[in-house]
């Protein structure tokens, strides 16, 4: 159950997109010096993300203890063939149905683009999802600032690393993290243009912060 999930996690609070460097599934490669094309350095206004989060998301939940009893509108998100869920430290593996569907679509399109280039199979790495009010509070305290991650309170928002990708197969051509980060940028850009999501390029956090615009 949920309680067991939390018992297995070491609960430390770090920056929103900070995460471990390796995984027991596949092999994760990291390059913090990748250059994302300027077209994919999304700068959607936080207010737009927050408006969408409140419109399409759930009512914020105070604590992880209360999350156990109040997650009916949230869907459990687990690693699969399309994406790897990183070891979550300041969030829980839940999203709304709409957000979970968009995350899967990003993963599918990312892999389709790799396949087109005859590149080796990789998955995207998800570094943050649903946050309780207490998670937000502790993150702010740890960072000693008032960074506003509140879109994560509504289950509509997730962070995807653009510096780390998880290799799941060795057939095909080797592919650099820089190539993959721009493929990821293109995929998110296409969905953003369709009105599926808003996005913010978080250089200091090495992630793209995505808020969906659908139920």
Language-model features: locations:
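Extracytoplasmic/periplasmic, Sec-exported soluble proteins
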Residues: 91-102, 131, 149-152, 172-179
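Stable alpha-helical elements in mature extracytoplasmic
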Residues: 95-102, 106, 120, 135, ...
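Extracytoplasmic cell-surface/polysaccharide-interacting catalytic and binding patches
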Residues: 18-114, 211-214
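Alpha-helical scaffolding within the catalytic cores
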Residues: 141-147
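Extended, low-complexity, intrinsically disordered C-terminal regulatory tails
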Residues: 107, 111, 118-141
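Catalytic cores and adjacent binding grooves of peptidoglycan-active enzymes
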Residues: 147-215
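Bacterial N-terminal signal peptides
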Residues: 7-14
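Short, small-residue-biased leader/transition segments that mark boundaries at the very start
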Residues: 1-6
């Amino acid at each position: 159950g949920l309680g067991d999930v939390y018992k297995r996690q070491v609960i430390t609070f770090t920056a929103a997109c900070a995460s471990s460097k390796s995984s027991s599934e596949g092999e994760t490669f990291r390059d913090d010096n990748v250059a994302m094309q300027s077209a994919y350095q999304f700068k959607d206004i936080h207010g737009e993300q927050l408006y969408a989060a409140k419109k399409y998301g759930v009512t914020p939940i105070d604590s992880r203890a209360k999350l156990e009893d109040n997650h009916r509108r949230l869907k459990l998100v687990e690693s699969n063939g399309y994406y790897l869920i990183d070891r979550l430290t300041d969030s829980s593996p839940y999203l709304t149905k709409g957000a979970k569907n968009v995350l899967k679509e990003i993963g599918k399109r990312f892999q389709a683009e790799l396949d087109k280039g005859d590149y080796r199979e990789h998955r995207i790495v998800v570094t943050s999802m649903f946050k309780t009010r207490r998670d937000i509070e502790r993150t702010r305290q740890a960072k000693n600032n008032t960074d506003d991650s509140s879109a994560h309170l509504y289950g509509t928002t997730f962070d995807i690393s653009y510096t780390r990708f998880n290799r799941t197969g060795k057939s095909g051509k080797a592919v650099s993290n820089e190539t993959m980060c721009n493929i990821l940028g293109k995929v998110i850009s296409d969905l953003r243009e369709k009105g599926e999501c808003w996005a913010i390029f978080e250089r200091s956090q090495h992630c793209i912060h995505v808020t969906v615009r659908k139920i």
